[in-house]
């Protein structure tokens, strides 16, 4: 009888983890996942220098933005970041 109760409790805990876990809920904020798809696309083509780089930390439709050279413009990296 005790084994049956332990088994039932274990199953409930495992099911609770699967169905109630925040990582599986599809919810979340941008702070939970820094590479989550964001629409910072307004920064694509923005002027960037070493001193003023608006591309840092920006993501456009799953592609991270970066400044290829000093005194250039923000472009998207070719590597896709799943989000």
From Swiss-Prot:
It is found in: Secreted; Nematocyst. Expressed by acrorhagi. Contains 3 disulfide bonds. GO terms for cellular component: extracellular region; nematocyst. One of its GO terms (molecular function) is toxin activity. The modification Proline amide is found at residue 82. It comes from the Eukaryota. Residues 1-20 form the signal peptide. Residues 21-36 form a propeptide. Keywords: Amidation, Cleavage on pair of basic residues, Disulfide bond, Nematocyst, Secreted, Signal, Toxin. Toxin. This is U-actitoxin-Aeq6a. It comes from Actinia equina.
């Amino acid at each position: 009888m005790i084994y049956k109760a332990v088994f039932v409790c274990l199953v409930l805990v495992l099911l609770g983890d699967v169905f109630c876990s925040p990582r599986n809920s599809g919810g979340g904020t941008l702070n939970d996942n820094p590479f989550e798809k964001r629409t910072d696309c307004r920064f694509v083509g923005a002027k960037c220098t070493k001193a003023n780089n608006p591309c840092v930390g920006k993501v456009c439709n799953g592609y991270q933005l970066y400044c290829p050279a000093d005194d250039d413009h923000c472009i998207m990296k070719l590597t896709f970041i799943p989000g």
